[in-house]
């Protein structure tokens, strides 16, 4: 059984160059780590994935990216993510996170935590 994680996040075209680079770097890092099976990116119909992602990722890691489109001029809601997970990712280990969160070995700590069963749980990571 493949118990790696499916990460879900949102991508939007930030007008701030530094912020845009930070978001792209997080997506890149999350695609490279072995603990992720897929990275589902929610973005509107008018937004394109930055070409820099395909330039820096291997073909195998780039294929982890799955784009889910939604109507223009609308940000994704928690309901959008939960509905998508229920319809398309039943039985998967899913994590919803802000688009600027990058993971390393932390995902193994979640998956291997004692006295914590991932089954029937949905993990959402954000910051205050």
Task: List the model feature ranges, each with a label.
Residues 120-128:
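Short beta-strand-to-loop element that shapes/binds the nucleotide-sugar donor at the catalytic cleft/hinge
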Residues 1-24:
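N-proximal low-complexity "stem/linker" segments adjacent to membrane-targeting elements
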Residues 3-9, 30, 38-41:
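Hydrophobic targeting segments
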Residues 20-37:
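Short, acidic, metal-binding catalytic loop of nucleotide-sugar glycosyltransferases
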Residues 96-114, 124:
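Acidic donor-binding/catalytic loop of UDP-sugar-dependent glycosyltransferases
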Residues 42-94, 105:
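Active-site-proximal specificity loops/subdomain of glycosyltransferases
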Residues 12-17, 47-48, 100-104:
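Short acidic, S/G/P-rich loop/turn micro-motifs used as interaction or catalytic elements
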């Amino acid at each position: 059984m493949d118990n790696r994680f499916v990460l879900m996040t949102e991508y939007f075209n930030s007008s701030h160059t530094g912020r845009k680079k930070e978001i792209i770097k997080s997506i890149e890092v999350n695609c490279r780590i072995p603990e992720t099976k897929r990275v589902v990116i929610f973005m509107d119909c008018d937004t394109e994935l930055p070409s820099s992602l395909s330039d820096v990722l291997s073909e195998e890691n780039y294929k982890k990216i799955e784009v889910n489109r939604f109507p223009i001029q609308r940000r994704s809601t928690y309901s959008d993510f939960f509905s998508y997970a229920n319809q398309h990712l039943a039985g998967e280990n899913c994590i919803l996170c802000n688009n600027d969160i990058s993971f390393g070995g932390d995902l193994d700590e979640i998956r291997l935590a004692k006295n914590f069963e991932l089954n029937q749980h949905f993990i959402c990571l954000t910051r205050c």
